[in-house]
Amino acid sequence: MKKVVTIVLLSLVTAFAVHSQSPLGKEGKQLNAGIGLSGWGVPLYVGLDFGVARDFSLGVEGSFRSYGQKYTGSHYSSTIIGLSGNANYHFNRILEIPSNWDLYAGLNIGYYFWSTPANYPGTGASTLGLGGQIGGRYFFKKNFGLNLELGGGDAFSNGKFGITYIF
């Protein structure tokens, strides 16, 4: 029993002692895709992030959603296309997080193109959005993982869930 406990403890110490900077790293690229949560339909998104420094990344992202609502007794459908950029700081190095995890936070800015019927009486104008996000990724393979991001203050989404591929 003592041997089993020792092996388990050594394994845990080794697992948490092995850490690195952001899995993306400087000059790395990662592709992200998934679905989001929003008050204006369910967005589908795809994005590309670039490692610009050891712990910093810049990215671009596009999203699409179709949103239907009943307003003054009639049904209206809107389409929203978003184009945004983001900047993130990755906390792996300073928090000594294992390299199969990626914890980050940052800011985003984007423009959201609303397409609504001409007779739509509600609000739904194209707009500029500015927001913040905090997120994490878990890489179950060296280059492939899952991502979860929570955000606010913009027209894009309140949260996102998807996949990440580093190349």
Predicted regions and their residues:
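Short loop/turn motifs that connect adjacent beta-strands in outer-membrane beta-barrel proteins
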Residues: 21-28, 54-55, 92-102, 140-143
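Cleavable N-terminal export/targeting peptides
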Residues: 1-26
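Solvent-exposed loop/turn segments connecting transmembrane beta-strands
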Residues: 32-45, 71-75, 124-127, 148-162
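Transmembrane beta-strands of outer-membrane beta-barrel pores
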Residues: 35-41, 62-68, 91, 109-115, ...
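Transmembrane beta-strands of outer-membrane beta-barrel proteins
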Residues: 29-33, 58-60, 83, 101-107, ...
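Flexible, solvent-exposed loop segments that connect beta-strands
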Residues: 22-31, 61-83, 111-130
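Transmembrane beta-barrel domains of outer membrane proteins
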Residues: 47-49, 88-92, 135-137, 151, ...
